Amino acid sequence: MNYSADSGNTVYVGNIDPRITKEQLYELFIQINPVLRIKYPKDKVLQAYQGYAFIEFYNQGDAQYAIKIMNNTVRLYDRLIKVRQVTNSTGTTNLPSNISKDMILPIAKLFIKNLADSIDSDQLVKIFNKFGKLIREPEIFYLSNGKLKCAYVYFEDFEKADLAIKSLNNQLVANNRITVDYAFKENGKGNAKYGDDVDRLLNKEALKHNMLK
């Protein structure tokens, strides 16, 4: 589901208990910054809230502050709510230059190490899309002063990424034994990698509501 308002000013709130009302969401977020509007979808048949909302603030700074303060810190009916930046329907974002899409999209990012010189991006797609849909083109780069060929591969689904790791890690590909694991997070604390419980929960919700299409 895509939200047509200014994406830079809007946050996605997930893992909401259906007992939470729109008024309660408003009262919660108004404590952080002024709220312009809230979109809180209901199931058309059951008329029950679907567990997620879009909250639009008056400016991008207010939205970013809400993410910083509210994400994974507030518990409603024993559920930690998840707050992330909204992306628009064209796949672009209105984000500050120091924040990349990989930091806010709940996708499965893998780190591939020790690739053979003959392996290019198209070959990586052929190798990895056997396990599941790739959300974007692989990125190839070099470490160790250009001696170690590596890549990032982006899966839409963590379960498919798990399968790729299980099947390909420490296997020979074009006569090179490669390492396949989740990548380190750009904005993570310490050595945090993609694939933790929060990532997987957000990924399932995003897939359920077609937010990665």
Swiss-Prot record:
SUPFAM superfamilies: RNA-binding domain, RBD. It comes from the Eukaryota. InterPro entries: Nucleotide-bd_a/b_plait_sf (IPR012677), RBD_domain_sf (IPR035979), RRM_dom (IPR000504), SF3B4_RRM1 (IPR034158), SF3B4_spliceosome_assoc (IPR052084). One of its GO terms (biological process) is mRNA splicing, via spliceosome. Residues 9-88, 108-185 form the RRM domain. One of its GO terms (molecular function) is RNA binding. The keyword Transmembrane helix does not apply. Possible SF3b-like factor. This is Protein HSH49.
